Amino acid sequence: MSSLPVAAVLSELLTALDCAPQVLLSAPTGAGKSTWLPLQLLAHPGINGKIILLEPRRLAARNVAQRLAELLNEKPGDTVGYRMRAQNCVGPNTRLEVVTEGVLTRMIQRDPELSGVGLVILDEFHERSLQADLALALLLDVQQGLRDDLKLLIMSATLDNDRLQQMLPEAPVVISEGRSFPVERRYLPLPAHQRFDDAVAVATAEMLRQESGSLLLFLPGVGEIQRVQEQLASRIGSDVLLCPLYGALSLNDQRKAILPAPQGMRKVVLATNIAETSLTIEGIRLVVDCAQERVARFDPRTGLTRLITQRVSQASMTQRAGRAGRLEPGICLHLIAKEQAERAAAQSEPEILQSDLSGLLMELLQWGCSDPAQMSWLDQPPTVNLLAAKRLLQMLGALEGERLSAQGQKMAALGNDPRLAAMLVSAKNDDEAATAAKIAAILEEPPRMGNSDLGVAFSRNQPAWQQRSQQLLKRLNVRGGEADSSLIAPLLAGAFADRIARRRGQDGRYQLANGMGAMLDANDALSRHEWLIAPLLLQGSASPDARILLALPVDIDELVQRCPQLVQQSDTVEWDDAQGTLKAWRRLQIGLLTVKVQPLAKPSEDELHQAMLNGICDKDLSVLNWTAEAEQLRLRLLCAAKWLPEYDWPAVDDESLLATLETWLLPHMTGVHSLRGLKSLDIYQALRGLLDWGMQQRLDSELPAHYTVPTGSRIAIRYHEDNPPALAVRMQEMFGEATNPTIAQGRVPLVLELLSPAQRPLQITRDLSAFWKGAYREVQKEMKGRYPKHVWPDDPANTAPTRRTKKYS
């Protein structure tokens, strides 16, 4: 084993660990950094205490532990053990623990000093998983505040040294060049006219015909693996084994894919990107890389995750190609044009930038950090995702201000997804706890194919679910209890209230309580049910509606009875346009879904009035009784605000009046419950109520409703919003006046509409003096003949005004 590439840098690495709290190691997959180096570190006297080795994937963790134990001629659980979500294999003599990501976070939270631990190794850090970034942030905090003697080794196949060195400028960097054989990299774009599965199968079969050795085929997801496997089966010989490899497979099935092919056989391993770096797959000489991957993208707007298929980064293509050169010179066929490969992103985007951060936020709050920016990150968590995480934790009752509530502390202690943790801590007795634990186990590892009915899955007794539920019950300190299907709905509803769904139409479409759309296949048996709880959703790429992956049909009346806290009751009084009156309803709602609507017999006077006000807002002010007097008062107030701005006039534009209906109109609405009643309201008096006595006097003085002309006649002034005020008066009543009268403290002259004895306009003037001296002559000449009994003097500016004819003058 000393011939492994990493052995060449062992001395340098040990010296670095002796001198520095953090060390960076860059070594390709297969260099021995996971399956040999930890044992050398275990024997190093400079490491005081246990070693914790973090492996991001369960299969890798178990394989690494198995391999390390074999090198010691032991079984896992002796010197070397492992811990993962549903499996623990450690003993009293265990000094090296291989753990998965969530397990390491739990260890740090339960014992922040990591008592008895001398070294933590973060393996495959280049994958930049969310949990690895969190673990690094927590460990750096531990080193800074609690354990300056704790050592941290960050290992990676393609270490992003520049970023890490900026973050850890004092950390030594140790580089192992590794050992690999030349790999011929070929490029072949897939035909546009051919289905992806068929084209990949054809290219893979052709590679097998032309070349010897076993082959590793990279595909984006499980669906493609299964379809390509089916296509390949008819294109290969009997000496070729087809071995799928992806995370959801059982550990035994995964091991079949990584072990060497039997003597005289070849194998094709059809894998997701799980096989890029974290696993050593025996016997591979050929690689076919479809150059695609499926990644999860969280949408903070909807709170859902979308799976997208995208081109892999150049770093991933290099890693995939490298798999062909571990044993001998190999060949990698990238199913993409070389020009496209060269335009691909250099590195993959870190999970922390595109993930649901509710679990991370809960972990940070449990750690005592309410501001994530206080921690050390390679990439800061996006603010918008943190806000979405905070909203979810608030909905689950996990927050009290900026800290965890008592319930939130219980949730965080479990180490589960926040929704599942909320469901688990809500259990009030052993049976509820057993039921919640089984639901959580199913939702953590949902069935891959087939029935989308959660109730059907719950009825099965799969060993993995049973094992996980027992582990969760142990965390809850529950020893007994029976899982009961009748308890599923109320338990789910507490954690997934926003995902209660009601059918809309007959084509499998539903609306969620949060307002989003969701859909089932129209042929799915669940689509016959009006109400569902859909805890497992996936945001579609082709449709705005989410896809329901797993759901439970519910009796909504029973659910409301058992979970009354879900329901918001609102009494609504609405305007009935057809009748011109009000109608009252009581609505029971879960989020935006209406559960039940029933007539309300006796709504309160306040509710009736509020409904009337709402109706006015909906229809606008025209439904009110705007008499000429009321309209003129409103115009006077609008003009007063422009002409006398130094006074505090009320705003009476449409928007302001609608916004203040409760102030000026409501006091006059006693007993008004219909459109007819509205039409009877005195709007003039209601508007006058906006002014105190002093302002009423000022308005009547400065912008009067009427003007008294020299003859004593009291004539209404016509106010306009965009034109000057006007006074329509018979010409004879303005004799003796040299200028136009003014209002608003003399600032605004009245436009005079001078009328004939028959009340018809003769002249409109803004300059009475100029009119008497000029155009009046033409008017005089014409009017003398038409109205000889009326006075038409030669000098009107100096003639006494009159309302009479000559006979009475």
Residue spans of the language-model regions?
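P-loop NTPase motor module signature
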Residues: 1-423, 483, 538, 722
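Conserved helicase core region in the C-terminal RecA-like lobe
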Residues: 102-103, 270-274, 291, 506-524
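Extended active-site and interfacial segments that coordinate phosphate-rich ligands
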Residues: 111-126, 136, 290-294, 303, ...
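Charge-dense polyanion-binding interfaces
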Residues: 121-122, 250, 254, 426-447, ...
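Short, isolated positions in well-ordered beta-strands
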Residues: 181, 518, 714-716
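Acidic, serine/threonine- and proline-rich low-complexity intrinsically disordered segments
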Residues: 399, 432-517, 530-706, 745-809
